[in-house]
Amino acid sequence: MKNKSVIEEADDVRRAVEMVQLGARMQMLEVETRLSREKLLRIYKEVRGASPPKGMLPFSTDWFMTWQPNVHSSLFMNLYRYFTGPAGVHGLDAILKSYHLYLDHIETGVIEPALSLTRAWTLVRFFDADLLQMAACTRCGGEFVAHAHDPVHDYVCGLCNMPSRAGSARRKTTTRKAVAPTHKTTAASRKAVVA
């Protein structure tokens, strides 16, 4: 094992804590820090209060092509491209800053984030491996995640050409939540009328 400076180790611990707080998986921590697996496990358990989940990382580019994940991953990639381009931030710092900004943007719209930090990290790795590319929508001009080497001259994004069932699961839960308080209000008003 190489000798590390105390400052480098402290920086790795800080990054590991931040990644765990954002929901990173152990595989990401192991790749992005120089800390031992045992130390990462201790950090994970201390921050989360539980052992890290087991299992494989996402490995398919197809997940990023479905409607909602494509919109979220495209937002993240545009933020990431800004940080690595004009802002001059690179590596893990660019991923973390982009992910923080992605979460801030999603939370203002009261939407659940579809993209986890580990998926965002995997997305960047897919771009680095030339498995994915950005494609400009011919209708709105926005840039969206697309398979690499797919023809993009007539590309139309998922927002301009929304699938017929897009958002139906969200509408069902919103409708159920809206119906429940109305029913309780009606029951309460009946009790008030009877009394």
Curated annotation (Swiss-Prot):
GO terms for biological process: bacterial-type flagellum organization; positive regulation of DNA-templated transcription; regulation of bacterial-type flagellum assembly. Transmembrane segments: none annotated. One of its GO terms (cellular component) is cytoplasm. Zn(2+) binds at residues 137, 140, 157, 160. Binds 1 zinc ion per subunit. GO terms for molecular function: DNA binding; zinc ion binding. It is found in: Cytoplasm. InterPro entries: FlhC (IPR007944). Residues 165-195 are annotated as: Disordered. Pfam families: FlhC. Keywords: Activator, Bacterial flagellum biogenesis, Cytoplasm, DNA-binding, Metal-binding, Transcription, Transcription regulation, Zinc. Its cofactor is Zn(2+). HAMAP family: FhlC (MF_01891). Belongs to the FlhC family. Heterohexamer composed of two FlhC and four FlhD subunits. Each FlhC binds a FlhD dimer, forming a heterotrimer, and a hexamer assembles by dimerization of two heterotrimers. Functions in complex with FlhD as a master transcriptional regulator that regulates transcription of several flagellar and non-flagellar operons by binding to their promoter region. Activates expression of class 2 flagellar genes, including fliA, which is a flagellum-specific sigma factor that turns on the class 3 genes. Also regulates genes whose products function in a variety of physiological pathways. This is Flagellar transcriptional regulator FlhC. It comes from Thauera aminoaromatica.
